[in-house]
Each structure stands twice: as structure tokens, then as C-alpha cells.
Design a protein with these regions (language model features):
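Signature of N-terminal electron-transfer/Fe-S-associated modules in redox systems
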Residues: 1-159
């Protein structure tokens, strides 16, 4: 009988929402698992766990990534931003406030991923037309169907 041994932990030194983090992570541990289970950032949601719904979207060095498909070890030396890193105390980030004003959330489950993707869209200057916004945001699913309101919130900030 052959015994399998677990691979040695991998050192992870990163910044999460501007705070330095030093952890030993398993080589198979996803960024989503580390954020939610080890660091307590539960705003990042686990939806499909297959990269199809966008609920787990976070920013790594300003680029959107699906944290359920990203190994935590890949984030060594990088800046990770979650939905919790946007507000300043009780003051919402302007995009968060626009989502509220435009009623761009219903159940709210997809909202953190929607907002993180929208931030990347805006940073990349991809908010040309409403069709372009919808295309960029197509990787983020909303079961409640708040898509027109999501586009309106993004459009407000883009202008």
C-alpha cells in the first residue's frame, strides 16, 4: 500500500485590501478558499465553483480574476482587492453607491462580483456603449435579472 503525502505548504506574502498578509497555503488551495475561510472576507461569494458565474470575482493587481479558479499561491507578491476593500468606513465607494441608487441588486448574492468586474471595466476604459458594458459584464450572472440596472449604475460612474 502506497501512502500519499501532502505537498509542503507554500509561503504566500501578499496584500489584501491594502493589508500585508503572510500565510502558509496548500498548493491546491484557491484564492476564494483563502479569502473566505482563512481571512474572513466573506463578501467574495462561492457560486458555481467552476468559473462560470462570476460571483467570486476579485481584483488582483487591478485585473479581475475568478478567485475560485485562481490558486492562492499564484497571488504571492500581489495586491488582492475584495469588495470589503472598497468602502472607506461607512462611506461607500462611488460604484457601490451607484448600485444602490439604481437598484442594481435584488438578492445581492452576485453584487460583490458584479461590482469588482465593473471596477475593472471602468479602469480599462471599456464602458463605451451599453452593449460594450453588457459584453464585458457577461461573465457575471444575476439570477434576479437586474442587468438593466447594473448597466445604468456602471454608465453613471463612467460618465
Amino acid at each position: 500500500m502506497t501512502h500519499r503525502t501532502s505537498p509542503s505548504p507554500v509561503a504566500l506574502t501578499a496584500s489584501v485590501n491594502g493589508v500585508p498578509v503572510d500565510l502558509a497555503v496548500a498548493s491546491h488551495e484557491t484564492l476564494l478558499e483563502v479569502l473566505r475561510d482563512r481571512l474572513g472576507f466573506t463578501g467574495t461569494k462561492k457560486g458555481c465553483d467552476q468559473g462560470a458565474c462570476g460571483a467570486c470575482t476579485v481584483l488582483v493587481d487591478g485585473k479581475r480574476v475568478l478567485s475560485c479558479l485562481t490558486l492562492a499561491a499564484q497571488c504571492d507578491g500581489r495586491e488582492v482587492t475584495t469588495i470589503e476593500g472598497l468602502a472607506s468606513g461607512d462611506k461607500l465607494h462611488p460604484l457601490q453607491a451607484a448600485f444602490v441608487r439604481h437598484d442594481a441588486l435584488q438578492c445581492g448574492y452576485c453584487t460583490p462580483g458584479q461590482i469588482m468586474s465593473a471596477l475593472a471595466l471602468l479602469a480599462e476604459g471599456r464602458a463605451g456603449s451599453d452593449d460594450e458594458i453588457r459584453e464585458f459584464m457577461s461573465g457575471n450572472l444575476c439570477r434576479c435579472g437586474a442587468y438593466p440596472n447594473i448597466v445604468a449604475a456602471i454608465r453613471e460612474i463612467a460618465e
